[in-house]
Amino acid sequence: MINNSGFAASEITCDQFLPSFGNVLVAGDALVEKDPETVDGFCRALNKAIEYIIDGHVEEAVDMSIEKYAPTFAEKRDVVVQILNDVFVKTLWQSDYTAENGIGASNPEKWQALINKSKEIGNIDETFDAAELLYTPAK
């Protein structure tokens, strides 16, 4: 975005030091326990939308989003399309793991490695089981 605004900038991605894996959705334990249908429905809807975008509908999704929700991004449309194509579609939303387990699937081994690394570099005081954080929606 900065480069496209006429300013030269280099990028240091967090993945070089502390990787992230796709989308992160947060729901409290109470909501998950009280209304799992809503949590599951939201996850399924998001995954369906991501699959649709990946399947060649990036420009359509950006145009609809600008029109309905973010009209101030109209002048940045082409940059947003480029970012979605270059980052989200190619690497953030898809991986070998999601190819095998479906869009939106979380790799517990990678999350555990991230938790362990976070302890190692002092971001957290104690490690814990990644399974405590991961939720798999009903099919």
Feature annotation, model-predicted:
Residues 34-121:
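Secondary-structure end/capping motifs
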